[in-house]
Swiss-Prot record:
Alphabetical list of NCBIfam families matching this protein: DnaJ_bact (TIGR02349), PRK10767.1 (NF008035)
Localization terms from the record: Cytoplasm
Gene Ontology biological process terms in this record: chaperone cofactor-dependent protein refolding; DNA replication; protein refolding; response to heat
All copies of domain J, residue ranges: 4-69
Subunit organization: Homodimer.
Protein name, as recorded: Chaperone protein DnaJ
Annotated binding of Zn(2+) 1, by residue: 150, 153, 203, 206
Pfam families in the cross-refs: DnaJ, DnaJ_C, DnaJ_CXXCXGXG
Source domain of life: Bacteria
Source organism of the structure: Rhizobium meliloti (strain 1021)
Known cofactor(s): Zn(2+)
Sorted UniProt keywords: Chaperone, Cytoplasm, DNA replication, Metal-binding, Repeat, Stress response, Zinc, Zinc-finger
């Protein structure tokens, strides 16, 4: 029996893309054939890891696996409850499985019912927001051009006063069988195009499609703490279904614009702040404006070194759907003076002359240890 793909990668079933990639890289490094030459078990594990990752990183393949397990990818192989034949007795064949799944996923093929009803396609809308908007959350108005149910024929596709008729070729199934040698092949009905119905007198507004294109304005609630790459689903806001079929969904893909001052890592924020050499040496204070619009004071003690971090607790990003908040880390950068005047140069030279080892313990100790090291080598 094949191993569970999530178990193979060592992740939970709700693992996100980042967790999948991290687990894959870690295991791939461990079992890579170049690191384990001649080890057949490692080679086998490496192949299993690759297969698991290739399946789970693809949203459609992952949905197929979650629903049907390994049976979704086995030609002619049926999972429990799928029946015995590939195309006989009303059982789902390999292609039918994918029609069921992908008809519900991101614009895949829709499976037609015997009444000619088709589910509308899912739609994607890309939205870019600022870090400030991700911090506070917002309700955004978006305009989406999409197909909606025709208001003249109410989605039937037929002229008012008439109705679609059951296709006489396929008897409403949308599929016909044709014998070819020893095989019986099922294909889309050429008369109705797989809809199971024919329209003798189509609606003049939608031309028999049952829907028309229109731009709609929708409200999208973006919660505080939303992260870059988050997907928001608006159920039933995709394309209208055909001939009374259910509407698809609208997926909002969010991207957060890079910020001029802040970098984000989960719920924590990082900001590099340059200070003068004298402030670092003598100490000082400065204010930082945080994303909530308030100012926080940072106290720099004398002798502060470059790279020193100060933590402002609770001044980071809100955690999505939680009362918790991340922290803001201020990283100190020391700016070396440039374009010195003659007097400034003289003062710095004088400072250098009167400085002692105690003023610069790190550099003094470093060069002393380096000298001792090379002296030892030359002995």
């Amino acid at each position: 029996m094949k191993r569970d793909l999530y178990e193979t990668l060592g992740v939970q079933k709700n693992a996100d893309e980042k967790e999948l990639k991290s687990a894959f890289r870690k295991l791939a490094m461990k079992y890579h054939p170049d690191r384990n030459p001649g080890d057949q078990e490692s080679e086998k594990s490496f192949k299993e890891i690759n297969e698991a990752y290739e399946t789970l990183k693809d949203p459609q393949k992952r949905a197929a696996y979650d629903r049907y397990g390994h049976a979704a990818f086995e030609q002619g192989g049926m999972g429990a409850g799928f029946g015995n034949g590939f195309a006989g007795g009303g059982a789902h064949g390999f292609s039918d499985i994918f029609e069921d799944i992908f008809g519900e996923m991101m614009g895949g093929r829709q499976r037609r019912s015997s009444g000619g009803r088709e589910r509308g396609a899912d739609l994607r809308y890309n939205m870019e927001i600022s870090l400030e908007e991700a911090y506070s959350g917002k309700t955004a108005q978006i305009r989406v051009p999409t197909s909606i149910t025709c208001d003249v024929c109410t989605g039937t596709g037929a002229k008012p006063g008439t109705s679609p008729k059951t296709c006489g070729t396929c008897q409403g199934t949308g599929r016909v069988r044709a014998a070819q040698g020893f095989f019986s092949i099922e294909r889309t009905c050429p008369t109705c195009g797989g809809r199971g119905q024919t329209i003798a007198d189509p609606c003049t507004k939608c031309h028999g499609q049952g829907r028309v294109v229109e731009e709609r304005t929708l409200s999208v609630n973006i919660p505080a703490g939303i992260e870059d790459g988050t997907r928001i689903r608006l159920s039933g806001e995709g394309e209208a279904g055909l001939r009374g079929g259910p509407a698809g969904d609208l997926y909002i893909f969010l991207s957060v614009k890079p910020h001029e001052f802040y970098q984000r890592d989960g719920a924590d924020l990082y900001c590099a702040v340059p200070i003068s050499m004298t402030t670092a040496a003598l100490g000082g204070k400065f204010d930082v404006t945080t994303l909530d619009g308030t100012k926080s004071r940072v106290t720099v003690p004398e002798g502060t070194q470059a790279g020193k971090q100060f933590r402002l607790k609770g001044k980071g990003m809100p955690v999505l759907r939680s009362s918790q908040t991340g922290d803001l880390y201020i990283q100190i950068q020391i700016e070396t003076p440039q374009k010195l005047t003659k007097r400034q140069r003289e003062l710095l030279q004088e400072f250098e002359q009167i400085s002692s080892k105690e003023n610069n313990p790190e550099s003094t100790g470093f060069f002393s240890r380096m000298k001792d090291f090379f002296d030892t080598l030359s002995e």
